[in-house]
Design a protein with these regions (language model features):
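Helix-loop-helix junctions that connect adjacent transmembrane helices in secondary transporters/permeases
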Residues: 296-379, 543-613, 633, 693-718, ...
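Signature of N-terminal electron-transfer/Fe-S-associated modules in redox systems
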Residues: 1-156, 596
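Glycine-rich loop/linker segments at domain edges
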Residues: 90, 164, 170-176, 306-349, ...
């Protein structure tokens, strides 16, 4: 027992427990986020006697007489100051790390009211952010310090026109910690669910015994595969991910669930899981594409006739002949690793029984409607009996596209008729959700005497792990974009993705392009040296320009801005070369929208509510990219309204039309265009009537992004409705070899909110600095050996200067000219860094993370 003070209120805690559990589960102070419970991420920071401390570390019995402050306990002025400062700086994206950042910032400012930038960065060194790259968070801390010193909060600008630098609409709830992520939901009678997972990557489940677990007091139910009323398998495209592995069936990887346990409290849940007895027959497994493709290899998916998950072959022109006649030819092999998304919010879902016998899911994912489709099929019910509502989503980057906890929560609530929360531990999260594919690449490039690319021929092999996830589309995108953003005709690439008994691989920011771009751009840097021209010059000569044809045959439109990104970066490049600094350069392109002939709809309803305001309803997940703010800006601009006349209602399958997954850099473009079309209808209706006259009316907009399938027999197929382009540059410190500065110029079409665009660029650059230099997801016979704190994520005090350049080049006649930017920000970073290190020490590096750098000895 211990007595201490929380936010000015004395409390007595009878039961010894981690402080985070008391603050969250008993006091419901939801600003104290549970990102890892391992002392690694910093989302649970609180002040203990004025010192920032991770609440997942101390036990309550050790806190006698202490004074604890959470964000909820800050003064009204402090809350307002941090909210304004973080909004003005653009510091908030997914928001899950932000309350912890605020606490660390307050701890600093209380001791040092006028900190330097370096001091602010050091103060948050124990707080990880995966979205922002820390730059704008540090800006926000410095602005908050200024406001707190001066005692006055500036007036917030309310210009929400497209192109304005605006505060995101969800800043206050994320800064102050009252916005609800699924783990922040507490309802009366709520139970806790979890999975008993396989002990072996590949084994036959001989039998499962649940009686001992079921007999434990406080256990509600124990479910196995025989309890599933509908389809056993889920899957984003291929239905090859078992909800539960049944008796007699074979596990595919260590994350496979064999039973689900539901209990009245977390302690009982963990006890009961240990009482479920499972007997296995361990079987031979495969842990890489070479093993998986060998004759007679064990099948990962029974009945699949081998382990080939996907095959793609992209051909245009005659690459082999073009290379044969090239003046210069290079042939090299490249390798990129597994990497983990490391979003701050672990997967969580709260499932509530409905009166109609169905369930409602409060969840964190990248598409509420996809979750609805998969869970309703698993339950064997229609959509009315399986409703899904997105709460706030604490980051995704592709890692929350697949089912992780939603189907398990749905099954428990449906069978047991109790509200239940299912949340992955951080170690479960590291195991269960799909990662970035490791790839092995073989590239040959030919150029003429002027450095003009004549042809590229390549092969790609990827490991897609224990189930398909998005392995096929990722492989396809890796292949189609391997040609680079250049104007030449002869291109051939063949790709193979293999099932293995490793954890699954799927969508990850860049969607396969990050891997092949490393190969293409590294080879192009080597080619520049061979030809005798600069890396900048070889790109400028080959760069795709409006009206020209990409290697895939698509004619690009007037919005194409690769040349502008090169020109924007040139002064920085020339200055670095002049100063003798090691400098590297790389370009990239990335599609916006699904493309390649697949259905790709954006949908949006504008509903005039009883409050006389326009309510935006679009079935698209906001995972930190700021979609809600984008849609509000589009409505204000296109419907000619003021900010206070517009409300963003969020994403719920019960009220919003399906706008597809938040992936492929598609939502700003596709759902943004649907929103614009709805605005035009509303504007017409408002010509002779006021909003109050239109109460109850709905205005529906839909956009279908029509494209041609891969291999379409047309002269100039449209693979994607739009592409974004980028050039990034890395400058190293000549003395230390560490990164001194990153410059990133990105063509975004029309920047809806330039402040958000800068934040996306900075965050993507830092994420791929990790990809290039420090991050790894090591496996030992299919078992992850890293913890969150050992993944190699960059921290705030390690970040160099980052110059984000937003190239505003309208021209696309969709969504006010906007093109998605979420993925491309992380694509050209690694090859730019690799080239800088070549200039530093003369060593060519063709695998990631890069060897022999100050970051990795």
């Amino acid at each position: 027992m211990a007595a201490f003070v929380v936010n000015g209120t004395p409390v007595t805690v009878e039961k010894n427990q981690k402080l985070i559990r008391y603050l969250r589960d008993e006091l419901h102070l939801t600003s104290v986020k549970d990102g890892c419970s391992e002392g690694a991420c910093g989302t649970c920071h609180v002040l203990i006697d004025g010192k920032p401390t991770k609440a997942c570390i101390p036990q309550t019995d050790k806190l006698e007489g202490k004074h604890i402050v959470t964000v909820e306990g800050l003064s009204a002025f402090e809350k307002e100051a941090f909210t304004y400062a973080f909004g003005e700086a653009g510091a908030v994206q997914c928001g899950f790390c932000i309350p912890g950042m605020v606490i660390s910032a307050k701890g600093l400012i209380d001791q040092n009211p006028d900190p330097t930038r370096e001091e602010a960065a050091f103060a948050i060194r124990n707080n990880i952010c995966r979205c922002t790259g820390y730059v704008k968070i540090i800006d926000g801390i410095l602005l908050a310090a200024k406001i707190l010193r001066e005692g006055k909060i500036p007036e917030k600008k309310e210009d929400f026109q497209v192109g304005s630098r605006v505060h995101r609409i969800d800043v206050a709830e994320k800064v102050q910690g009252y916005g609800k992520y699924p783990d922040d939901i507490y309802v009366d009678g709520m139970c806790y669910g979890g999975a008993v997972r396989s002990q072996y990557p590949r084994a036959r489940v001989l039998y499962i015994r649940t009686k001992e677990a079921e007999a434990l007091p406080g256990v509600v139910c124990v479910l196995t595969a025989k309890d599933i009323p509908g389809q056993q398998n889920v899957g984003h495209i291929q239905k090859d991910q078992p909800t539960l592995i049944g008796e007699g069936e074979i596990t595919q990887y260590l994350g496979d669930a064999v039973a689900l346990v539901c209990a009245r409290d977390l302690e009982t849940l963990e006890q009961a899981k240990k009482l479920v007895r499972v007997v296995y027959e361990e079987l031979p497994a495969v842990y890489g594409p070479e093993e998986a493709s060998a004759p007679g290899a064990p099948e990962v998916i029974m009945g699949n006739r081998g382990n080939l998950q996907a095959h793609r072959h992209v051909v245009r022109g005659n690459a082999e002949e073009a290379i044969k006649h090239s003046k210069y030819v290079l042939h090299e092999k490249f390798e990129t690793p597994w990497t983990e998304h490391a979003f701050l919010e672990p997967e969580c879902c709260v499932a509530l029984p409905l009166e109609n016998g169905g369930v409602k899911l409060l969840t964190t994912d990248q598409s509420a409607h996809t979750t609805q489709h998969e869970c309703s099929a698993m339950l064997g019910v229609d959509f009315a009996h399986c409703q899904v509502e997105n709460m706030l989503v604490g980051g995704g980057f592709g890692g929350k596209e697949d089912m992780s906890v939603q189907h398990h929560a749905a099954l428990i609530a449906y069978i047991a008729r109790v509200p239940v929360k299912v949340k992955l531990t951080r170690q479960e999260s590291l195991l269960v959700h799909p990662k970035r594919h490791p790839m092995w690449m073989d590239f040959t490039m030919g150029c003429d005497e002027n450095g003009i690319i004549q042809g590229v021929k390549a092969s790609v092999v990827s490991d897609t792990g224990g189930f398909a996830s998005l392995g096929g589309p990722v492989l396809e995108r890796a292949c189609t974009h391997a040609a680079g953003p250049y104007h030449y005709e002869n291109f051939e690439i063949e790709g193979h993705a293999y099932y293995t008994n490793n954890p699954p691989a799927g969508a990850f920011r860049g969607f396969g392009v990050t891997q092949t771009c490393f190969a293409t751009e590294t080879l192009l840097n080597e080619m520049a040296d061979l030809v005798g021209i600069s890396p900048w010059e070889i790109r400028y000569r080959n760069a795709i320009r409006p009206g020209e044809v990409l290697p895939n045959g698509q004619i690009v439109g007037p919005e194409t801005g690769l040349v502008e990104t090169l020109e924007a970066i040139k002064p920085y490049y020339d200055e670095a070369v002049k100063n003798g600094e090691p400098v590297g350069l790389a370009c990239a392109m990335k599609n916006a929208g699904v493309g390649v002939g697949l259905p790709d709809y954006g949908r949006c309803k504008l509903v005039i509510g009883d409050d006389g305001k326009v309510h935006i309803r679009a079935g698209a997940s906001c995972i930190g990219q700021g979609l809600g703010t984008v849609l509000v800006q589009l409505v204000v601009t296109n419907a000619k309204l003021t900010r206070d006349q517009v409300v963003y209602d969020g994403n719920s399958t019960f009220i919003t039309p399906d706008s597809g997954d938040t992936s492929g850099s598609r939502q700003t473009l596709v759902t943004g265009e649907a929103c614009r079309r709805a605005c035009l209808l509303l504007r017409d209706a408002m010509e002779y009537r006021s909003l109050s006259d239109l109460k109850g009316q709905e205005f529906y907009g839909e956009y279908y992004a029509k494209t041609n399938p891969l291999g379409a027999n047309v002269p100039n197929p449209v693979s994607h409705v739009a592409y974004g382009y980028a050039t990034q540059m890395c400058i190293l410190d000549k003395e230390t070899g560490k990164i001194k500065k990153m410059v990133a110029a990105h063509d975004v079409g029309k920047a809806i909110n330039p402040l958000s665009c800068e934040g996306q660029i900075e965050g993507g650059v830092v994420m791929s600095m990790g990809y290039a230099l420090t991050e790894q997801y090591p496996l030992d016979h299919g078992k992850p050996t890293a913890k969150y704190g050992t993944l190699g994520l960059f921290r705030s005090h390690q970040i160099p200067e980052i110059k984000a350049i937003v190239i505003d080049k309208p021209g696309l006649n969709l969504a006010n000219g906007a093109i998605g930017i979420g993925e491309i920000t992380s694509i050209p970073t690694a090859p730019a860094i690799a080239q800088a290190y070549y200039r530093y020490d003369g060593e060519r590096r063709r695998s990631l993370p890069l060897d022999h750098t100050p970051y990795k000895k």
